[in-house]
Amino acid sequence: MRKQDEEILGTYFRLEEYQKQRLRFERLLHPEQFKWSGPTPTMSATKKIKLAELEKIGFGESFYRRMADGEKAARKELEDLAENHPLWEYIKPIRGFAKYLAGAFIAAGGDIERPATASAFWKGMGLDVLADGTVPRRTRGDKQTTRRIPAFPHVTRIGEQIRQQMLRQNPCYQELYHRHKADYQARYPERPKMFAHKHGLRIAQKILYAALWEKWRQACGLPAPFPYVFDILKHDSGRRFTIEDFYSKPG
């Protein structure tokens, strides 16, 4: 793995751990900072005892403050690293893709030297399909999803963050989502609407990731061939989607 990408991955893991601990103790020490469906829970006698014991072993207010400060510092470090990454110049114009999300995406992508094709990159990012072309998903009666090598948990979490942000803010991503969602509903009208929703999200994300994979490889001086034409990567005009399609248009 390239040293710059390794630094980003390490910083992301540190940020994630700071955030996890901060949220854990924020819920215990400062429940008023959360949005509750009802009134803020009161401090029970049991919780008071728990907090007192946690304080004795160093997990009190001072620990919470350290985690909150560490989270802010790690986030700033991740954003700075992302801004100095060669992929940033291609990500910067994408509406909905701020510096934090760019750093998180690079952390999820990991070693860009390994996936020599867009489909290999999709697999590492948890967007692969099974041999029959279906999406890995649980079926009733099965305990595990059929997938040879599942994506890392942090890759899945980052993918969800990217989907949410892009669907809210990026016009090209929104258009791709709605188009492929409608196409799925037309082909499988008997299936649950959630399947169509997830299909639209998945295809839009695969198109975005393929474009980012190409620029990332090229920015690092690596070949980025498309050995065959992916139908879903085609624009209405017949050309393949590129990262520029996701850029904010003037006016």
Give the positions of each predicted feature.
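Phosphate-backbone recognition surface of nucleic-acid-processing proteins
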Residues: Y90-P93, A104-K198, R202, K215
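Long, contiguous secondary-structure blocks with strong helical propensity
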Residues: P41-I49, E79-I91, K143, I243-P250
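Coiled-coil termination/hinge junctions
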Residues: K72-G110
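Acidic, carboxylate-rich catalytic segments that either coordinate divalent cations
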Residues: Q169-G251
